[in-house]
Amino acid sequence: SEQQXGRDVGGAL
């Protein structure tokens, strides 16, 4: 996710 710099399971950059 964007909260995690885009490298989490959310996948959003």
Curated annotation (Swiss-Prot):
Q: Which UniProt keywords apply?
A: Carbohydrate metabolism, Chitin degradation, Chitin-binding, Glycoprotein, Glycosidase, Hydrolase, Plant defense, Polysaccharide degradation, Secreted
Q: Name one GO biological process term.
A: polysaccharide catabolic process
User: What domain of life?
Assistant: Eukaryota
What catalytic activity does the UniProt entry give for this protein?
Answer: Random endo-hydrolysis of N-acetyl-beta-D-glucosaminide (1->4)-beta-linkages in chitin and chitodextrins; Endohydrolysis of beta-(1->4)-linkages between D-glucosamine residues in a partly acetylated chitosan
* Class in the EC hierarchy, top level: hydrolase
**Statement: the UniProt record of this protein carries the keyword Mitochondrion:** no
Q: Which is a Gene Ontology cellular component entry for this protein?
A: extracellular region
Q: What is its EC number?
A: 3.2.1.132, 3.2.1.14
UniProt-recorded Gene Ontology molecular function terms: chitin binding; chitinase activity; chitosanase activity; endochitinase activity
Q: Where is the Chitin-binding type-1 domain positioned along the sequence?
A: 3-13
Q: What is its main location?
A: secreted
* PTM comment text: Glycosylated; contains galactose.
* Intracellular or extracellular location(s): Secreted
Q: Which residue positions does the secretion signal occupy?
A: none
Function, in words:
Has insecticidal activity when consumed by D.melanogaster larvae. Has low chitinase and chitosanase activity.
Q: What is this protein called?
A: Insecticidal protein LA-b
